[in-house]
A protein has these predicted regions:
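Conserved GNAT-fold acetyl-CoA-binding loop/helix
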Residues: 28-47
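Conserved active-site alpha-helix within GNAT-family acetyltransferase domains
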Residues: 141, 152-154, 164-172
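Conserved acetyl-CoA-binding loop-helix of GNAT-fold acetyltransferases
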Residues: 124-130, 135-151
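Conserved acyl-donor/pantetheine-binding loop and adjacent beta-alpha core of acyl/acetyltransferases
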Residues: 67-127
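Conserved GNAT acetyl-CoA-binding A-motif
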Residues: 121-123, 151-164
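Conserved beta-strand-loop-alpha-helix junction that forms the acyl-donor binding cleft
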Residues: 126-132, 160-171
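A short beta-loop-alpha structural element at the N-terminal edge
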Residues: 5-20
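A short helix-loop-beta-strand connector motif used in the catalytic cores of GNAT acetyltransferases and
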Residues: 47-61, 72, 79, 84-85
Length: 172
């Protein structure tokens, strides 16, 4: 019998579980984390930032109904024109974190989505994580679709993302 998997908002009681899931299922397979060395360790400032984003109430998860464990998730955050995702001074970051965030910031040099769209807020789909044993089942696609639906429902004018991980199209 096929399991019914539902997308649901990330409950505060699951924040720590989701952080552990990210470090277990996302970073060890994510090219930027592997190249920078971030996959091998966690930085408390980065974890604190993830928790701040989770408290915004826009992250989503899929849980296995049999085990009640997270098997996929979308770490999302709300953006404001006046806010920066991290301090401009990267000196407070570990080298691995600094390397990734400076690279991602560099991708947006010369382009300001807020000015382009003439808006003051938006959303970022920061990470899509799927348990390795559940890849190729469309869970990342479902999380993306639900993130878009949530943004529309909330009147958020745009969603941005910097994908760096290939999507698995079929579970071989």
């Amino acid at each position: 019998m096929k399991k019914c998997l539902t997308v649901e908002p990330l409950a505060e009681s699951r924040h720590q579980e989701f952080i552990e899931f990210i470090y277990r299922e996302f970073f060890p397979r994510e090219p930027l984390a592997l190249a920078s060395g971030l996959a091998a360790k966690s930085n408390p400032k980065t974890v604190d930032t993830f928790v701040q984003w989770m408290h915004q109430g826009v992250s989503l998860v899929i849980t296995d109904p049999e085990t009640n464990r997270i098997i996929a998730g979308a770490l999302n955050c709300l953006l404001k024109k006046s806010d920066l995702l991290f301090d401009v001074d990267y000196s407070c970051m570990e080298e691995e974190d600094k390397c990734i965030w400076m690279f991602l910031d560099h991708l947006e040099v010369g382009y300001n989505v807020f000015e382009e769209l003439k808006v003051d807020s938006g959303m970022e789909l920061v990470f899509l994580c799927v348990n390795e044993s559940h890849t190729g089942q469309g869970l990342a696609r479902r999380l993306t679709e639900e993130t878009i639906a949530m943004a529309r429902l909330r009147g958020i004018p745009f969603i941005k993302s910097n994908p760096s991980t290939p999507g698995i199209l079929a579970n071989n």
